[in-house]
């Protein structure tokens, strides 16, 4: 401590331990003050739309990011995203902020789980540094030999063993063999090894005149086996210093004369050992491992055919073999059906006996080797295989029926050269622990973790890999801990769900070992079964324990209970939210008065989602048989109609594959609606005539335009425009309903084109979004704003919340508008403005706007609605409102199928389909189906275990 400086007070250290936010006013936040303890796990909770994300992301993260960007030079700032300063008085004690959101982080088709977690980068280095190249011919390791290697090989024999040091005859283009041997004679070399016999060069020239007159380097050059070898020295094995020195000189001479090759022949066995200073073996020249060799983003490593994508346009296996439960004999090869093309199948079956090919085995049970025979052929089968069939079609393309058949089976398929590995063939020759990099990236992460945990390396390799292995194993353990053990490193990033992407980013953050940072996470429990939540909490605590502050926007009860500090935003949503209802450790919630906070009421049990008194009966259903897409194991599933069906299971068990990739797409195909091809299944049967339409309701934004809003989506604004156009002033001025549209020329402000704001780009500062000077943010021309209904113009109406608008239009008996708006209120969105831009809505709000649209349509035709995790972003209280809306759909004669982890939804289902028992390869089976009570009674699987607690609560 320096003299003259006061000792730090307790108050100072207390403040240093906290992040202080004063007067936050972003979006609906009402000038709130928040204190967040540093190095803690903090959960921000509250109703959907209450202002949680406004505090966590739009205030804390935005300011942390802005401060980081501001610290850079003006030159660097022009290349970075420009950040707004959030509306608040001040934020003190804010560490560098990192946001991990629910967005799929990469749309790049080259990005994989391995590259995004950086594990693949470490694997590349590992294989480049300690990988051993194995010859595919002999299975021996390929090495660049040194004289020491040759000496060690010789000394491996017992003392006194006779051997010769040999070199291949150096081939000089344009010279005859005789001329080359004459040069050796001049150099003092006098003998050759001819098939193990030692002969003098003069004798060989006399005995083989024809061979000696052959010109080297010409096409008529004899095979390498017929060439004699040049004898450099004759020795016997001895560990004597002089003998070893002589051997070393001879070996160096052999390498020089043999152009990098040397041979040892031992007697009396005449065994021949080959050594080379070149990286070659078995007549193949190999490339030495470098990290670029294993990079599919580098031209040095990427497969030349698919250029590192792993997929090419070719013959699609799924189109050729649509039903893998059939055998070759039963007609699994679709293009070999019919009278004419069936001859190919018959001929293949006849010839298959030559190699014992199992023609009665289902296609999905065939080994990779057996599939290669079927697709690429075998010498014993002649030219009968699938590839040869399509080559025949290509040769005869002048026939229109062949061109049509080729087009029918063409699609994106796995690259035949690299078999989906994305790498050149040389990469597969390099092994670590007996496995190639391709083998490792195709293993599930849980298996890969075990592989590295038990990896045995030589002392030298272990020393080289000492810094690489901990980086790889720690990241693999983190991925397993966040419930992603079923993924492979080769899985493309753009096929991951939002929840999976977020947890991969979380594992990457843990692996990076950053400390002293602020991590802000948006519902990391999304897509996570209750079984995995405890492991997620452990990971969040690890992130905290290394010295970070972790702020989590979350609704999951287990995570709320595990928090060090809770901030409850509310009390309601929208304009009725934006306040701190209570903040403190979990134990403090008992002091909050009942009815003040929905969160506290649910935690204490005062408010809860009740289990239905009875389950709906059903007698109509749609059945899928033999579903084998992705990891599904040929399961038979029945989806009841006219009830609420919930599909449950741990992460990676196959829920999305079953419902979205197979069931939904199969229904689309049944209705002849264009869409992606469904995953593999044998048949779909049942009461398909009982439904007339199908709708898949996801969380994607309701509109891409900034002018898109809830009122336009549910068609309520159409009624409002008609109402405004019917007013007397509109009639006098000749206004039509289109005049009141901000998406069309006519009535909208020509300056801002109906946006109400003008964006001004600033080179080194954040873009300025200024109120339009022409319309003052009201979107329309003045003459349009002069038209009023009951004292309100179109801008005033768009500024109303849904609740206010319903009250206003009900008062003035405009029931057509109320009818369109009511469903938005019913799904719990009464707090949002009519004209609120869809860009500002959360994923959960977008999904509920879509639900409201379907509720407002009142379709007479029975429709099948499929929801993908509709509880995302929803508080306990919001889930209750959502369930009422879903039940309203069912009461109108529709059917509802939900992919969901939330047990409050599962306990309210009429029918549960539980997949599992684990994720990835260990999933894809039907664990249980039936009512929640029947699933619990069966007692199998994780869902039954956790659901039992909910039903008994």
Predicted regions and their residues:
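Conserved phosphate-binding elements of NTP-dependent enzyme cores
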Residues: 2-953
